[in-house]
């Protein structure tokens, strides 16, 4: 959530920043401006009524001695003022709720360093690493490679759960497990604390990280009360672990990692992406989360992105890193890097990780603060990133390491976890 004071102190700055994401957001800014204006007018009216009530209440005692009739009139007026105040105070509460609900639907403001743009066409490539493999044959997509090896079974998955689910078996299941262990071990060596969080969270937890209320249709909701949801990313429980707390600056940065199943309805139409492991309703992902002070978060974003890139370097996969433009960033993000892995069957890079600095946006929603060295209480900055999407990493390995005879070489870094060097 943005700081509501910005709408009073720097309204033009807010408009300019949010319009760089999407000009349609100016409608919500206008609603907040009008609600704030109405709120202030009502508040002034209530304060004036309260002062008048207090003045009359003080005079009643004196008037009772001197002029009982006037005292009676004053008491009637006090009663009328109380009734009017009560009505207006109720109106104030309703306006506060409207302001809060509207603010929850306004995204974070992009950092000034972010390129202004409309969509992914305006994203900026930052760097590339690794060489795409060359083949003496036409490479198959991972779906075909996995099915021929008998390690991916989408037909059975469809019988069990419907479309856009995957069933991994044998070496496919073992490769998935090896990837998760490899990633978690790699991140643990860099100071991240491994966590096994719940995969079901309460509604307010999703409000904290920004999935709700805006993206409710993308979430799998459980029936009954209290309202609970399956997590779409481990960012949700990891970032909320310290909600409502005041941390000491010496404790920062907090660095957390988890490998969890993730659940997303993915209601849109994605063409070829509905085939294979690229865009499923359930998938495994290793997540990175950092809780930072307000000064170091952008340096930590660079470090987190490097940590995610290091996973791909270790696997020998070619990738590129792009900085997202204002129009392509996620709801809670102030700055985002996407890491894209090379997919030979498509002859292009595909997203495998997204690393974001959410500044104080999520912290305000979950009331997560810290006491700085001077003793001042501030909101923390929160960062999150995929370290990385496991299914997409598995897909990239099947495609990049496939051999002409249909076998797949296991990347060296995975062999201690997997136990052999080839899948055939």
Curated annotation (Swiss-Prot):
GO terms for biological process: selenocysteine biosynthetic process; seryl-tRNA aminoacylation. The keyword ATP-binding applies. Its EC number is 6.1.1.11. Signal peptide: none annotated. Consists of two distinct domains, a catalytic core and a N-terminal extension that is involved in tRNA binding. InterPro entries: aa-tRNA-synt_IIb (IPR002314), aa-tRNA-synth_II (IPR006195), aa-tRNA-synth_II/BPL/LPL (IPR045864), Ser-tRNA-ligase_type_1 (IPR002317), Ser-tRNA-synth_1_N (IPR015866), SerRS_1_N_sf (IPR042103), SerRS_core (IPR033729), tRNA-bd_arm (IPR010978). Homodimer. The tRNA molecule binds across the dimer. This is Serine--tRNA ligase. HAMAP family: Ser_tRNA_synth_type1. It comes from Elusimicrobium minutum (strain Pei191). CDD domains: SerRS_core. It is an enzyme of class 6 (ligase). Pfam families: Seryl_tRNA_N, tRNA-synt_2b. It catalyses: tRNA(Ser) + L-serine + ATP = L-seryl-tRNA(Ser) + AMP + diphosphate + H(+); tRNA(Sec) + L-serine + ATP = L-seryl-tRNA(Sec) + AMP + diphosphate + H(+). Keywords: Aminoacyl-tRNA synthetase, ATP-binding, Cytoplasm, Ligase, Nucleotide-binding, Protein biosynthesis. Belongs to the class-II aminoacyl-tRNA synthetase family. Type-1 seryl-tRNA synthetase subfamily. Catalyzes the attachment of serine to tRNA(Ser). Is also able to aminoacylate tRNA(Sec) with serine, to form the misacylated tRNA L-seryl-tRNA(Sec), which will be further converted into selenocysteinyl-tRNA(Sec). It is found in: Cytoplasm. ATP binds at residues 264-266, 351-354. The gene is serS. One of its GO terms (cellular component) is cytoplasm. It comes from the Bacteria. One of its GO terms (molecular function) is ATP binding.
């Amino acid at each position: 959530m943005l700081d509501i004071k910005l709408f009073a102190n720097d309204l033009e700055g807010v408009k300019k920043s949010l319009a760089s994401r999407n000009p349609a957001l100016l409608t919500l800014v206008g609603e907040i401006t009008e609600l704030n204006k109405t709120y202030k007018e009502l508040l002034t009216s209530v304060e004036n009524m309260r002062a008048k009530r207090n003045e009359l209440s003080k005079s009643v005692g004196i008037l009772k001695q001197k002029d009982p009739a006037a005292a009676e009139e004053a008491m009637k007026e006090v009663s009328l003022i109380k009734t009017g105040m009560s009505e207006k105070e109720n109106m104030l509460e309703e306006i506060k709720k409207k302001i809060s609900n509207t603010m929850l639907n306004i995204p974070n403001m992009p950092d000034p360093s972010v390129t202004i743009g409309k969509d992914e066409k305006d994203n900026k490539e930052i760097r590339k690493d690794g060489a795409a493999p060359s083949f003496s044959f036409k490479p198959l997509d991972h779906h075909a490679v996995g099915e021929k090896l008998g390690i991916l079974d989408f037909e059975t998955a469809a019988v069990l759960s419907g479309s856009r689910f995957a069933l991994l078996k044998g070496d496919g299941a073992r490769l998935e497990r090896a990837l998760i262990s490899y990633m978690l071990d790699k991140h643990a060596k860099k100071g991240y604390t491994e966590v096994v969080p719940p995969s079901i969270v309460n509604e307010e937890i999703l409000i904290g990280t920004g999935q709700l209320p805006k993206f409710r249709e993308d979430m799998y909701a459980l029936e009954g009360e209290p309202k609970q949801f399956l997590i779409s990313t481990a960012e949700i429980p990891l970032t909320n672990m310290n909600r409502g707390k005041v941390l000491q600056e010496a404790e920062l940065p907090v660095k957390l990692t988890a490998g969890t199943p993730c659940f997303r309805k993915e209601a849109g139409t994605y063409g070829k992406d509905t085939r294979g492991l690229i865009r499923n309703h359930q998938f495994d992902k290793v997540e990175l989360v950092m809780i930072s002070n307000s000064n170091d978060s952008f340096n930590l974003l660079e470090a987190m992105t490097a940590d995610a890139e290091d996973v791909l370097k270790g696997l020998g996969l070619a990738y590129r890193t792009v900085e997202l433009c204002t129009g392509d960033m996620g709801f809670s993000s102030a700055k985002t890097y996407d890491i894209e892995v090379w997919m030979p069957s498509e002859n292009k890079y595909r997203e495998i990780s997204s690393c974001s600095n959410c500044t104080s946006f999520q912290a305000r929603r979950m009331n997560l603060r810290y006491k700085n060295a001077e003793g001042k209480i501030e909101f923390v900055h929160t960062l999150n990133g995929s370290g990385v999407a496991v299914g997409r990493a598995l897909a990239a390995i099947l495609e990049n390491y496939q051999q002409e005879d249909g076998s797949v070489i296991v990347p060296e870094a995975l062999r201690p976890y997997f136990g052999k060097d080839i899948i055939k």
